């Protein structure tokens, strides 16, 4: 009651002529403030309906009254007029003789002057009872809807949920109604559409219509949505009498699509009965469901749909939704076909596809892309979202009206996999939103052999979607027309509100997990029922025949026509001799490769820049390009330091990155940097987004003020997610080769939170799916006494997954050896020791004639190290990325005197040079830095080893022996020198944890391996 009184008081100046829009704009503020302008001085028990959930209803009635006093029942008109006039407690139900303010004091003390209307009290209570009843159906109707085609479902129902809402007259008492009220006519509230054009209905008819709307084959979950307009929109779609009607032509189209879906699976079963195909039997309605969503979206202007789905029904979707040539699908079953493309390939039910065709319903062009995915369920979700975001970005689709995504899920995975939650929480973030995804859950009520009761703690597998206020439409999959209607509404919702929506197809799985599996072991009763279940095609065909929509011969002709199509495609499939995986590309890059998919050249131009370009970028990077913009004093000092560096023709790490990004923007290359806290940088070194200290939320991105016609620069702090965000950025990088897409981990240690994306997509993606990707991973790494969780990006894991052979020396005389190496590798792994080399490797990533993932172990302490500087001279035209940086000190002047050649990578180089100088051993010990670890620079390291004929070889690293680079580098160095010498080790001892958390222990370990590195007798005892 306090809630309503507060709202009424705040809104008292409004008149009935003011619009609902004005009311709704002011209402949230009123609700938030809870500041009473007027309140009753006495208890208000006389108006109990103002408390609890009824207050929401009263607010909605008040909203309608403000717009038009005649739109509500007379009793409400009296109540609102009296309340606005300041009536005392208990008298708001009554009509005062005068509503003038001069009489208010008299009203409070002269009750006898007020005309009594005792029946109004009863009227209000009755109408509130009806409102409670309607609201009960809207909130809980889905719990008693007939959703299970098998009729045995109880796993989705919480035991506390009543078996029905109204099934017997004694339940009416719960709502304050009685059996005698069934034929009484009640005025309908504004929060329901069951009346159609009728403002009032008998209670019996109200209940019947609510049962039809909410308790049949569709269950609607939406009352948790905190937006009145959206709730009203959904109510109108499901409550309006007769709204779910289909024309005969629509029914025939639906039948034809069911024929294709069903007969495709039956054809595969006949031809390859012993092959795994993860068929769609039991949910054949999925195909017409998807086609309906696509049809509706196409009609609303969408011309590109990007899809992601698991293995279940994938071949059917490829054949009947995306329209992949059937012979290309059938030949995948031929075990004798040889693979024409390099790489491992993948199972047929993992492959993706890209196809442009005419939508026959809308007669509009539409592009369909199904993203390839691994068996790791739901892992493709953020990838699809990222690709969708990229396609929207490149075509200027800022509202998602042209490009959209559809994600398919299994019930067990949707509830069980955390990546679903991570992906949902990207859905409305400014730099990640795709303006609404349609989620379709194939809910066959079982996960392999696990019952829902053991697979989730929530009533439905879709409950995770509630966190983003996505409406959830549950539907019985054996009612094809109900499914089609729900899919139409889902597509309309996405087009109207640009928010996520979930369609839960409650179905069953006619076979086991795969066609070779026996489900009766674990679900005997369920599968006894399934064996009796008539296929949905047969049931729907019988229905249409009985309705006279089609006749039996027409139905049989439709079946034979599609069977003939399959047989002809099967015959053509036998002519296929070679299996081309490249025909299954999900993200082609037109114009980037030659027609046969090869790079247009095998060279890489210089990655250096003209000096005036470097100066210009440096000037912008060290200034604020916006007037009247106040920055933090500490940031002013950082920008001053940058200006001094530019004046001295030098760059540090942050400035080198700035120049790499800025120069690519000048060349029309979009740069996108994403990750946790990347705008400022975890180590406060980047500052790509400046914040006005006097105006809240006013920001400036200087990088977008470099050139008049530059490409846009996107830098965005991500949600605190690695798995979801890295998957998203991988998908973004799939869309175009002409973009530098980078994901930075807050610390490299946290990359294993995204291990699935790294292991299943980035590392083997090209081998499995012939799909290149140029994503860049920036992984802060370095042993600096910060403990086991802030020290190691686990380089040993990335290096272990490199695909080169450590025991085979490649042909070092091959033309363009370094470029060919890059082309053949599965990813590039670097650990730069200078800002200049970091600058070059970022630019090389785009200037290469192909794309490979780039893994960069970035430094922490080197960000401000006084020796970690690069002169402009090393960044000018003609300069390149240095795969190896050789010794250039006294040792290189007289190499025959060198007794030990130390190989290292990254930050440890600065520890080694400091120690070498302290020991005065600059002529005896040479230090060579390996900047590119994979592909391994055999050619350059052979020259280094040959340069120092009298030196023993050692690898030095700051990581523990069983971690870091040693196990990767040692066999390759040995192969390089034809095993002529041993390669000794100087570094930390093996350990389980990546680093110690004790500063003293850290320094002790550091000094110990430095002693080993410069003790020229250290390895003699092993010789």
UniProtKB/Swiss-Prot annotation:
Class of enzymatic activity (EC top level): oxidoreductase
One Pfam family in the UniProt entry: E1_dh
A GO cellular component entry from the record: mitochondrial membrane
Presence of the UniProt keyword Methyltransferase in the record: no
Regulation: Calcium ions and ADP stimulate, whereas ATP and NADH reduce catalytic activity.
Binding-site list for thiamine diphosphate: 312, 411, 444, 446, 676
Residues carrying N6-succinyllysine: 74, 564
Modified residues (Phosphoserine): 100
Record's catalysed reaction(s): N(6)-[(R)-lipoyl]-L-lysyl-[protein] + 2-oxoglutarate + H(+) = N(6)-[(R)-S(8)-succinyldihydrolipoyl]-L-lysyl-[protein] + CO2
Protein name, UniProt field: 2-oxoglutarate dehydrogenase complex component E1
Organism expressing this protein natively: Mus musculus
Organism ancestry: Eukaryota, Metazoa, Chordata, Craniata, Vertebrata
Gene name, Swiss-Prot/TrEMBL: Ogdh
